[in-house]
Amino acid sequence: MKKILLLFVCLFVCWVLSAQQRIKVACVGNSITYGTGLSDRATQSYPVKLQKLLGERYEVENFGKPGATLLNQGHRPYTRQEEYRKALDFAGDIVVIHLGINDTDPRNWPNYRDFFVKDYLKLIDTFREANPAVRIIIARMTPIADRHIRFLSGTRDWHGEIQTAIETVARYAGIQLIDFHEPLYPYPYLLPDAVHPAAEGAAIMARTVYSAITGDYGGLKLSPLYTDNMILQRDTPLKVHGIANAGEQVTVCIDRQRWITKAAPDGKWSVKLSPLKAGGPYTLTISTPHRILKYTNVLIGEVWLCSGQSNMEFMLRQTITGKKDIPQAADEQLRLYDMKARWRTDAVQWDASVLDSLNHLQYYKETEWEICTPANAAHFSAIAYYFGQMLRDSLKVPVGLICNAIG
């Protein structure tokens, strides 16, 4: 019996210590943080989603106040709200601040803009006083869509000015800056009322904060343009860039070049290759301690983007001379990256699944760099193909053609 009691006491003590060691995250903000506009903010707001992503080691609390301004002389200053006092009492180990949207109101920014940086720095100081070891993260604001009633009467411009002020605050305070604007801006449908993100948008915000806190950006990733058989531009410094987990060492190797960099806190990294002469084939290797990406049969030469509508999309097999030219199309040093449209832009009604895909910017089918053959040249842009052949004949270097035409 004593052993059972002792075991119970030990388990209880471990549970208490575990609870005490949870990392507290305070989400400070306005109605967007609060979850206004969501059908069920108790399950859909970004702090709730963040809690699920971070797991039991973290305790996330929502201190969003609808209508709150950062400006202390604004129409509803956050620092005068009960949510602010609760956030201070919470004394979070991490404080994530997303304020500024309501400061675009004509009652606020035109009159008190000069106080914004000062007021923001003061707000940060109060959280540092509540917990001297606190980690502060501030966010560039979510977008405001052009459907907003005041968008053209000042809101658009003031929104941009406030973004710049927020960046200034981050530099002065020496704190981490995250971006809620970039991941939401391409998706206006995620802002149904032009201001408040829908549930999917809130999930994107949560993922942004999760990555900022943990440094987890999903590991080493590059653009789909990087594949075997690709061509890189000759005779110019070449930027190679991608995503990795924050702080990870990234090594880029090609030919006799070897470059090492580290992923920034936002996961982004880049290196600039020294100019390469036309030739190859080479292997481009990009690696972190946890992943290696190797691209083979890479050539250095001329790279051209062939974009447009139906005239550019018009395929080689549709030309009068296609039957004669297609059998002669094989060329190991001509490479094609053919981006075919997922759906035709004909006068037909698209169903809901197509519209959903388009809303998610899924315009093109997946593709990769290919060596030019009669089979793939037949379905490639005729204009682009003949242009590429002309370059091959005159320059005597490898040529890469990227076609993203949609008729």
Question: What does each model-identified segment do?
Answer:
Residues 241-324:
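Extended acidic/polar, glycine-enriched regions
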Residues 217-222:
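Proline/serine/threonine-rich low-complexity linkers at boundaries of modular beta-sandwich domains
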Residues 228, 236-240:
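Structural beta-strand segments of beta-rich domains
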Residues 21-27, 32-121, 157, 276, ...:
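Conserved SGNH/GDSL esterase-like catalytic core that processes O-acyl groups on lipids
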Residues 310-377:
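Secondary-structure boundary elements
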Residues 1, 20, 52, 56, ...:
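Alpha-helical cap/lid subdomain in secreted, periplasmic
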Residues 1-21:
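Bacterial Sec-dependent N-terminal signal peptides
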